[in-house]
A protein has these predicted regions:
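Phosphate/diphosphate ligand-binding glycine-rich loop within oxidoreductases
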Residues: 36-145, 273
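Glycine-rich phosphate/diphosphate-binding loop of Rossmann-like nucleotide-binding domains
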Residues: 52-64, 148-227
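Short, structured coil segments at secondary-structure junctions
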Residues: 69, 99, 119-121, 176, ...
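Adenosine-phosphate binding glycine-rich loop
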Residues: 262-263, 269-310
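Phosphate-coordination loops involved in phosphoryl transfer and adenosine-cofactor binding
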Residues: 42-47, 152-154, 262
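Rossmann-like adenosine-cofactor binding region
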Residues: 200-279
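Positively charged, low-complexity intrinsically disordered leader regions
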Residues: 1-60, 64
Length: 310
């Protein structure tokens, strides 16, 4: 079993063993980093990072992660690249592959990332598309593992928009045997193909998937409560209509009471306080949102090292 040379586009493509291989390695790299022990596994290697959307956590965690691994990272804004002026993705893939050892991309269309990966001869990492956010979901479930000690049989409840975040959470929960209940307004349900993919994985792992439109019912006995913005990047024009549609799809104190007493509250960030989550809950004792943000660094370092190291 080796991830070397592979792409990282979706958790759906990973085996359960590969997920735990990444988690185990992330734990080791996190300990080394905390102890100040050098771990230059990617010495002399370069990561090209293409961004067609804004980012704080993803950009900084990948860039700092490459430095900590002894390599370097290039921030490539699509506004400044020829890809932003219409150069084909397949040409960009082959050109960059002649310069760098790995490509990370954040963009709109998931198909574009698949095309990039098809033509690139170096590993491609999906750092968010409209469909998926696999690096975030890996960091989140690694965080849940740290807090809960085990994943199988635990329940994650996602409240809000059926977006890239819940799609990747469905993939990973189904793989690792966590139950997942999702509450979205009826018109904003998760992608049907993704739900089917998760259902297949859930059969193997014993995980239970429930898709509802009632937040309180979904939150019953949850070990993890998760939410994300009502309007993702690219949907800013729908903000007003979404505010109406999502009223009530909020992690607040009432919802917290429905979950287990020791539930942990997660959000991939950036958060909109007063919309999908209240100030008191995100700042309260159940919230682990900054642990999740930190773990982006450690989990992505593990992914990059496993994909790109000699
Ligand atoms: N969670 C996340 O991906 O954050 P950024 O958009 O800041 O990268
Ligand atoms: N669903 C959000 C996640 C941001 C990290 C978005 O796509 O904008």
């Amino acid at each position: 079993m080796s991830l070397k040379g592979k792409d990282f586009l979706s958790v759906h493509h990973l085996t359960v063993d590969e997920i735990y291989q990444i988690f185990d390695f992330a734990r080791i790299l996190k300990a080394k980093q905390k102890a100040g022990e050098p771990h230059p596994l990617l010495k002399g290697k370069t990561l090209g990072m293409i961004f067609q959307k804004a980012s704080t956590r993803t950009r900084v965690s990948f860039e700092v992660g490459m430095w900590q691994l002894g390599g370097s990272a290039l921030f490539l804004s699509s506004n400044d690249m020829q890809i932003g002026r219409g150069e084909p993705v397949k040409d960009t893939a082959r050109v960059l592959s002649r310069y760098v050892d790995g490509i990370m991309i954040r963009t709109f269309s998931h198909l574009e990332v698949e095309e990039l990966a098809e033509y690139a001869t170096v590993p491609v990492i999906n750092a968010l598309t409209d469909l998926l956010h696999p690096c975030q979901a890996m960091a989140d479930i690694f965080t849940a593992l740290e807090h809960k000690g085990e994943l199988k049989g635990r329940k994650l409840c996602y409240i809000g928009d059926g977006n890239n975040m819940v799609n990747s959470l469905l993939h990973i929960c189904a793989k690792v045997g966590m139950d997942i209940s999702v509450a979205t307004p009826a018109n904003y349900a998760p992608d049907a193909t993704i739900v089917e993919q998760a259902a297949v994985a859930a059969k193997l792992s014993g995980s239970k998937i429930t898709i509802l439109d009632d937040p309180l019912a979904a939150a019953q006995d949850a070990d993890v409560l998760y939410t994300d913005v009502w309007a993702s990047m690219g949907k800013e024009g729908e903000q007003a209509i979404r505010k109406q549609a999502f009223a009530g799809f909020q992690i607040n104190n009432t919802l917290l009471q429905a979950a287990k007493k020791d539930t942990i509250v997660m959000h991939c960030l950036p958060a909109h306080r007063g919309e999908e989550i209240t100030e008191d809950v995100i700042e309260g004792p159940n919230s682990v949102v900054f642990d999740e943000a930190e773990n982006r660094l450690h989990v992505q370092k593990a992914i990059m090292a496993l994909l790109m190291a000699d």
